[in-house]
Amino acid sequence: MEARIDQVVAAVNTWIVGDDEEVIVVDPGTDADAVLAKVGDREVIAVICTHGHVGHAAAALDVAGRDEAPIALHPADRLSWREVHGKTEPDIEMEDGGIFEVAGVALEVIHAPGHSAGSVCLYCEDLDVVMCGDALAADGLVTSEDGFSNFASQLSSIGEHVLTLPAKTRVLPGHGKEFTVAIAEKSFDSWISAGPGSAAPAGES
């Protein structure tokens, strides 16, 4: 069975990567019922949070709990995770270059600090996609008002880790519609010139 990516749109975009047997849920968001309804009777083998903000991670325990799946988060976002889930810690500390496998495809962890210190992207060469959380969106960068965003680091992460991917790669963001690396590359210089005030706020992102 071929791997595919399903989407649930609620507070954020949730991406479900897998086939008819097993899936990995990326950014479970806030609505566990909606995510699990989309998953159906497939086994959740992992839940990955691109960062620890409430909008992306609130439903992690409920989604993972159904099939006792491990939850993965970069350790640099542990503080924001604890603001949502208290003393319940993630099971896997992600690091740059880590690999998750599902349905015959690999998801590579790309540490992309900026929106938060522990933000990551997940690149799947087999499916020509990168799931980028709040690293960027179709209309620009996504900022956070929690005091942990770093605009310069965010630009650096995008330039070094996203724009270097093949131009046809589909970018699946945490908010809004998908786009391609080629489209992001055309906008990059304008983001630099405009500065941090031009970035789109993400609310509880």
Model-derived segments and their meaning:
Residues V23, H111, A117-S205:
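Metallo-beta-lactamase
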Residues I24-V26, A46-C49, H111:
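Short catalytic-loop micro-motif centered on adjacent basic/acidic residues
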Residues V9-A10, T30-A106, S187-A194:
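Active-site HxH/HxHxD metal-binding segment of metal-dependent hydrolases
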Residues V26-D27, G104, P173:
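Small/polar loops that bind or transfer phosphate-bearing groups
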Residues I5-Q7, D91, H111-P113:
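Short Gly/Pro-enriched turn/cap motifs at secondary-structure boundaries
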Residues A3, A10-V12, E95, A117-S119, ...:
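Short beta-strand-initiation
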Residues M1, I16-G18, G97-C124:
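Core dinuclear metal-dependent hydrolase active-site scaffold
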Residues M1-R42, C121-G133:
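Conserved beta-strand hairpin/beta-sheet module of binuclear metal-dependent hydrolase folds
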